[in-house]
Design a protein with these regions (language model features):
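Extended alpha-helical coiled-coil rod segments
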Residues: 1-199
Length: 200
């Protein structure tokens, strides 16, 4: 009936309005707890998917009322309402996928920053080992220093993949245009330069 449609349409418009507030909040701009925010958003997406049938059935109900001329002369109003619900639903879906993308990018940035921090710390240790003035005082100490140096060289070589991953991640973040590209480039270049120096 028309009354049922009106009640359901009111309910669904209110529900979409509530969900839009969640879909358009910019919590992704604060990098703290980004993984938890991403998980919450995935649950939010699942909730939207679970309600898609409900929205489709309200739209179908409205179209049916219009087609059968059961709108008590309010066909245009019902038609307009259907248009509004359809537009709001599309807008909600678009904003939700946009937020999903931004959360993924923010998560990538968190991963990048953590990797920079780890590699920065590791490079600091390597640099202090390579700066050592100790050249050994006898054959045994020289052999120990050579072994130590070989281990450092092996460690440096073993970090090559992590450096490549860091560069790929930086590239992806810069291309997305979501974040401060200059800062990302500066961090990446600093790591690459220090790594190149440690390799020589």
């Amino acid at each position: 009936t028309l009354q049922q449609f009106s009640r359901d349409a009111d309910e669904i418009e209110n529900w979409i309005g509530e969900k839009l507030q969640m879909a358009t909040d910019e919590s992704y701009k604060d990098p703290s707890n980004i993984q938890s925010k991403h998980q919450k958003h995935q649950a939010f997406e699942a909730e939207l998917a679970a309600n898609a049938d409900r929205i489709e059935s309200i739209i179908a109900m409205g179209k049916n009322l219009v087609d059968k001329h059961q709108c008590a002369g309010s066909e245009d109003a019902v038609q307009q309402r259907l248009g509004t619900i359809t537009e709001q639903w599309k807008y909600l879906a678009a904003k939700t996928s946009e937020k999903s993308l931004k959360l993924k990018e923010a998560n990538k940035q968190r991963t990048f920053n953590a990797a920079v921090k780890d590699i920065d710390f590791w490079l600091g240790e390597v640099e202090s080992l390579l700066k050592s003035e100790d050249s050994g005082k006898d054959l045994t100490s020289v052999q120990n220093l050579i072994k130590k140096h070989q281990l450092v060289e092996a460690d440096i070589a073993a970090h090559e993949d992590r450096i490549k991953d860091l560069n790929a991640l930086a590239e992806s973040l810069v291309e997305s245009g979501q974040f401060d590209s200059d800062t990302i480039e500066d961090k990446r270049n600093s790591i690459n330069e220090r790594y190149a120096v440690s390799y020589t």
